[in-house]
From Swiss-Prot:
The keyword Phosphoprotein applies. Substrate binds at residues 10-17, 23-24, 62, 89-92, 100, 116-117, 187-188. It comes from Gallus gallus. This is Phosphoglycerate mutase 1. Belongs to the phosphoglycerate mutase family. BPG-dependent PGAM subfamily.
Amino acid sequence: MAAYRLVLVRHGESAWNLENRFCGWYDADLSPAGQQEARRGGEALRDAGYEFDICFTSVQKRAIRTLWNVLDAIDQMWLPVVRTWRLNERHYGALTGLNKAETAAKHGEAQVKIWRRSFDIPPPPMQSDHPFFSTISKDRRYADLTEDQLPTCESLKDTIARALPFWNEEIVPQIKEGKRVLIAAHGNSLRGIVKHLEGMSEEAIMELNLPTGIPIVYELDKNLKPIKPMQFLGDEETVRKAMEAVAAQGKVKK
């Protein structure tokens, strides 16, 4: 029998997801479809009778607004919410703002997959002449970060390295106290948590596609190990289509 239950939600489609652009630390908002995805995710949790005690999210509005939509749908908007840059999306460096299909056409699908999905190879860093450099690096929400903490690009390994300490130091104690935890975050920061929970290899995590807006449920034992595979709250067809859409993002448009 499960000792704890954890729910993860990847943010709904953002305006830049819709345009197929590398987003990373750029603060794109949800698209109208993304708002609906988040709302449907919340309704799935409501219909299943889920209640929570504390929520965690990033400092990026697409994750925060996803959480708002979920909390609204389950009528638990009063819950405490902890926001942290450590749950931000991976920083895509110089690729930020570029169309993924155009980048694949220019550099080849294999190179784009390496940048997007390799475990420890970061994309080229964002230089000071990048159109979004100041927008991101000078944003006051990051004013307290040290120079070492503020990235100019990240691999998945880098993303996990800054997300996991927060998981271990802030989220795990809440779960072990019996708090029912909801995390609304991003594809790569959530993949870091999933990799840690399931003990997945670097190769396996590269191939994992988390769908947007669909609640992911983990039943955990007292050592926070999953007692069964992750479950998705949603009908099978919705889940399958969502995961296929995520996998197709870095391919050349036919």
